[in-house]
Regions:
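NTP/phosphate- and nucleic-acid-binding module
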Residues: 2-25, 30-32, 40-44, 61-662
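Residue-level detector of alpha-helical hydrophobic segments embedded in or interacting with membranes
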Residues: 47-49
Length: 662
């Protein structure tokens, strides 16, 4: 340890820059961890059960073990056949848990599966679940090592190349975007994550209103009988629905372990159970029946910002959770053409939102019949490519035909006085866009936010003068106030980090991890020189000295340049990530072993395809690939004509985009 202290002294004597400081700190951290590990090994050796025990203690242990073995008939009651069956179950459950870990499933969601595994193991070896408690002479030691590792883990970001799924989860945790809640599959969106959603919501809400829709709100609870009215719709959501069956709790007075606890009151059971909304088509079309009478009431367009519940088995923060936030638009039209055009127009709005606000290029297209929304005649989608080569469905719009109108008896009187059925659409995006944002732009250092969606576009870090330099302090404050006013005057979102209890280096590190696009440093020397220092999150490696008089204008120009830089980088990655005209064998070989945890995967495959649900399912089973969409541009251009399906060899009907997806 003395050598370590000497090394630390020498290291901190020669730190020329903040970057080398971080490098030295990381190196010293590894060295200190090595000492900690050596100390842990020495402690473990002293406590190891492999070392000789005192004779009297050996006698007590042997006697206790023999008595337990003799009194445990379960330990010898398993037949060879039963033991083999149990071992097979243990192996299968272990493999399933490992697969979920590779997919980035949270510890909370893994817990019940781990409990099942332990239960199976206890059946195989009953003694493992009934180990004797330590005797009074054995003193329990606090698990300080575990506490330390938890602390280290909370600040550590796994590299993308090491494990892409874990990197994604680390970004969310370290950058304070969200964390697991006590409710299975539900997350707590923290202020920084929520502020990003606010930026998305504000931009999209203006687009929705420009589209002609008005905001409304509909109940969270939907009568089960409503879902039963549209057969395809209920089939699509039945397995994901959370059901409310009682309207009151009561104290359990029956004898048993739960006596005095709360139970659902048997006398408060609902005649028609309520569904926590998975989506709101049924509730909204029930209301449309009251609101639509004449052709003059059409088109009718409403939108709501809300939360929905879909009981997911395998969750991933932002990308797939049991509860999530979204907007859902619902429209009614007099003609099919009007409804289809509305669906396509809204998909264009979603694509522009991703491009202009999030700097994410997307592929627009139609879903295959197997992938359509439950109850829709056509589903349109935007698909984005993540850094690991997997696709992410980022928004959808649906042409519903007349299915919901007929299910809820929604009609209108046309100009000739005849009753006609109504045509419908629905469309939506969710907090999944935050996941897309993370996976598209972020790096191993933390979150990277395009300037237009960043909650804070510029963070200004003032560097205070010496304590007794009152003149310097006043000059710095005046320059700071002017700089901030100039930046805000240009419409920028600015944060001043003047915390006096946090070192400047720690501030830089924190805001870099949170993805703030531009940091401005302002110290006494800068003020005297009439300058400040710019440091961009990405795009420009070096710091830039800028005149205070030009700082606001330079910041606007630099942030616009950064927005374009991120979009172009994502476009290049998308273009490079699409494999053209591959054979099925080539795609299968590349995708069947591709996992979400791998970085720089094979990407997407644009191939000629004959629409066939049976073959589509076979491909999904063989290499886990799905049709992400039939891309609009290449299919409208007839690129599939004259080509053979890459799977069946028959005449193609579409160009299909295949790939693995989150």
């Amino acid at each position: 340890m003395a050598a370590t202290s000497a090394l630390m002294t020498r290291a901190f004597r020669v730190l020329p820059t903040a970057r080398t400081a971080r490098m030295h700190t990381a190196a010293l951290g590894g060295l200190c961890q090595s000492h900690t590990r050596m100390a842990g090994i020495q402690r473990a050796a002293r406590q190891s059960t492999c070392l000789p025990l005192p004779r009297s203690f050996r006698h007590r242990v042997s006697t206790r073990f023999l008595s337990q073995t003799a009194s445990s008939p379960e330990s010898t009651s398993l037949s060879n056949e039963a033991r083999q069956e149990l071992e097979s179950k243990i192996k299968a459950k272990g493999d399933a848990i490992r697969a979920m870990k590779e997919d980035g499933v949270s510890k909370q969601d893994l817990a019940p599966h781990v409990a099942e595994l332990l239960e199976l193991k206890s059946q195989l070896d009953p003694l493992s679940s009934s180990s004797p408690a330590p005797t009074t002479t054995q003193k329990a030691k606090p698990d300080t090592k575990q506490t330390k590792s938890d602390t280290e883990e909370s600040d550590y970001i796994t590299s993308r190349s090491e494990n892409y799924s874990k990197w994604y989860n680390d970004i969310i945790r370290v950058c304070d975007l969200a964390e697991p809640s006590p409710v299975r599959g539900c997350m707590v969106i923290k202020p920084w994550g929520m502020s990003i959603w606010d930026q998305i919501r504000n931009d999209l809400d203006a687009r929705i209103k420009e589209h002609g829709a008005e905001n409304a709100y509909f109940p969270l609870l939907i009568p089960k009988s409503f879902l039963s009215k549209e057969a395809e719709h209920v089939d699509g959501f039945a397995k994901e629905c959370a059901v409310v069956t009682h309207h009151r709790l009561t104290v359990d007075t029956t004898e048993g372990p739960n006596k005095g606890g709360l139970i659902a009151d048997p006398e408060a059971e609902l005649e028609d159970p309520l569904i926590i909304r998975p989506t709101s088509e049924t509730m909204i079309w029930n209301m449309f029946k009251k609101w639509i009478v004449s052709h003059r009431d059409l088109p009718l367009k409403v939108n709501q910002w809300a939360n929905v519940m879909r009981w997911e088995m395998r969750t991933r923060p932002f990308l797939r959770t049991s509860e999530f936030l979204w907007q859902e638009g619902h429209t009614a039209h007099a003609t099919a053409e009007g409804a289809i055009q509305d669906s396509k127009d809204m998909l264009d709005q979603y694509a522009e939102l991703c491009r202009d606000l999030l700097a994410i290029p997307v592929i627009k297209g139609a879903k295959s019949p197997s992938e359509r929304f439950a109850g829709a005649e056509e589903t349109f989608t935007i698909e984005a490519l993540m850094q690991n080569g997997w696709a992410l469905q980022s928004g959808t719009s649906h042409f519903l035909g007349q299915s919901f109108g007929k299910a809820f008896d929604v009609t209108f009187q046309d100009a000739e006085g005849k009753q006609q059925d109504v045509w419908g659409t629905s469309w939506g995006v969710s907090t999944r866009l935050i996941g897309a944002l993370i996976m598209t732009h972020s790096d191993d250092a933390g979150l990277v936010l395009p300037p237009r969606v960043a909650p804070v576009q510029v963070v200004v870090v003032p560097i205070p003068p010496k304590k007794n330099d009152e003149e310097g302090r006043i000059a710095l404050n005046n320059a700071l106030d002017t700089l901030v006013a100039d930046l805000k005057g240009k419409g920028l979102k600015v944060k001043v980090d003047d915390r006096d209890y946090v070192r400047n280096g720690a501030k830089y590190f924190e805001w870099e991890r949170k993805g703030v696009p531009l940091r401005i440093e302002l110290g006494p020397r800068d003020v005297k020189g009439g300058v400040c220092v710019f440091k961009y999150r990405v795009g420009k490696e070096d710091k830039e000295t800028v005149s205070l008089d030009e700082a606001a204008t330079k910041a606007v120009d630099g942030l616009d340049e950064l927005q374009g830089y991120l979009l172009e980088a994502a476009k290049e990655r998308l273009a490079a990530g699409i494999n053209l005209m591959a054979t099925y064998e080539q795609m299968k070989e590349a995708l069947e072993k591709d996992e979400a945890s791998e970085y720089n995967g094979p990407g997407l495959y644009l191939v000629p395809w004959k629409c066939d649900a049976t073959n589509e399912e076979k491909i999904k089973e063989e290499c886990k690939a799905t049709i992400r969409c039939y891309p609009t541009d290449v299919n409208e251009a007839g690129m599939w004509k004259g080509k053979k399906c890459f799977y069946s060899g028959e005449d193609a009907t579409h160009m299909a985009l295949f790939g693995r997806a989150f």
